[in-house]
From Swiss-Prot:
Cofactor (UniProt): Mg(2+)
Record Pfam families: IPPT
Binding, ATP: G13, P14, T15, A16, S17, G18, K19, T20
Signal peptide coordinates: none
Family membership noted in the UniProt record: Belongs to the IPP transferase family.
Name the UniProt record assigns to this protein: tRNA dimethylallyltransferase
Catalytic reactions on record: adenosine(37) in tRNA + dimethylallyl diphosphate = N(6)-dimethylallyladenosine(37) in tRNA + diphosphate
Keywords: ATP-binding, Magnesium, Nucleotide-binding, Transferase, tRNA processing
GO terms classed as biological process: tRNA modification
Function field: Catalyzes the transfer of a dimethylallyl group onto the adenine at position 37 in tRNAs that read codons beginning with uridine, leading to the formation of N6-(dimethylallyl)adenosine (i(6)A).
Origin superkingdom: Bacteria
Binding residues for substrate: T15, A16, S17, G18, K19, T20
Length: 315
């Protein structure tokens, strides 16, 4: 069954791990097209602080889902999933495989697993259900469940208080039955066979040094002027907007407001980027069925190329 599904490749990694450079090399040698999986690169006019690929790179290796909205707008994980699925179908129809490249792990998870899923336990709702059960008993609660979710109720004994409570809790939190949510989740499973590649550094200190060098280069390369230009072009832009919460932009706004000096701007920008990398690596460690490649290895391209070639030929 899986072998008949079209192939897709995830190329994931923390910021400054070399994802873009590797992806560009791969698409020039293989039948792939890049879809950006980056919540910062979706914004127009935000080039320096997002380390957006330059025009020369984009001409050699076009990236989908770059520059899709302006900084005043919001782009959700749900919107990403919708756009990515459409693009993946188009790429597949052209006889190529989608190469999804980036570090926004929530987007990767949403694409792979869908938007469904059950809500976390809610102490207040559970307390309400316990009070109701104290009055009418769990068989009475089971009857309530049968009225809204007969399929789940049919699988449960009237005395199965824990599962009855959970099913009623889910309904009260979402307005949907457990049965409906499970069906929704099944329908959202990604209809592709996946190769998931994670770039991770064998030496975290080298990644930290890269991050520091890159942020300093952004400062010298016009980050301040870029943010000044954004404020001029989009007068309603403010620090609480999603676009301005991107790493580097928040700190630059603080500097422009006179709240921090040059050294603090630099230090806070580097620290925030390192924190982002730490969160990205934590997500990656929790992902299943992932091929981990050391992004500091000289032959990382060769390793990725061989893995993808083998994956694409397995049809």
């Amino acid at each position: 069954m899986l072998i008949s599904q079209p192939p897709a490749i995830f190329l994931m990694g923390p910021t400054a791990s070399g994802k873009t450079g590797l992806a560009v090399e791969l698409v020039q040698a293989m039948p792939l097209e890049i879809i950006s999986v980056d919540s910062a690169l979706v914004y127009q006019d935000m080039d320096i602080g997002t380390a957006k690929p330059g025009q020369e790179v984009l001409q050699r290796a076009p990236h989908h889902l770059i520059d899709v909205i302006d900084p005043m707008q919001v782009y959700s994980a749900a919107q990403f999933r919708e756009d990515a699925l459409r693009l993946m179908a188009d790429i597949t129809a052209r006889g190529k495989a989608p190469l999804l490249v980036g570090g926004t792990m929530l987007y990767f998870r949403t694409l792979e697993q869908g938007l469904g899923g059950l809500p976390e336990a809610d102490a207040q709702v559970r307390a309400e259900l316990d009070r109701e059960a104290a009055k009418i008993g769990w068989p009475g609660m089971h009857a309530k469940l049968a009225a809204i979710d007969p399929e789940t109720a049919a699988r449960l004994q009237p005395a199965d208080s824990q599962r009855i409570q959970r099913a009623l809790e889910v309904y009260r939190l979402t307005g949907k039955s457990m049965t409906a949510l499970h069906r929704q989740q099944a329908a959202e499973i990604l209809p592709y066979r996946l190769l998931k590649i994670a770039l991770q550094p064998s030496d975290r200190s080298v990644l930290h040094a890269r991050i520091a060098e890159r942020f300093v280069a952004m400062m010298k390369g016009g980050l301040l002027e870029e943010v000044q230009g954004l404020l001029k072009k989009y007068p309603g832009l403010h620090p609480d907007m999603t676009s301005m919460r991107c790493v580097g932009y928040r700190q630059t706004l603080e500097y422009l407001a006179g709240n921090i000096d040059d050294e603090a701007w630099k230090a806070q920008g580097i620290a925030a980027t390192r924190q982002l990398a730490k969160r990205q690596l934590t997500w990656l460690r929790g992902m299943d069925d992932t091929l981990v490649l050391d992004c500091l290895e000289q032959d990382v391209y060769g390793q990725a190329q061989r893995a993808i070639s083998g994956f694409l030929s397995a049809v």
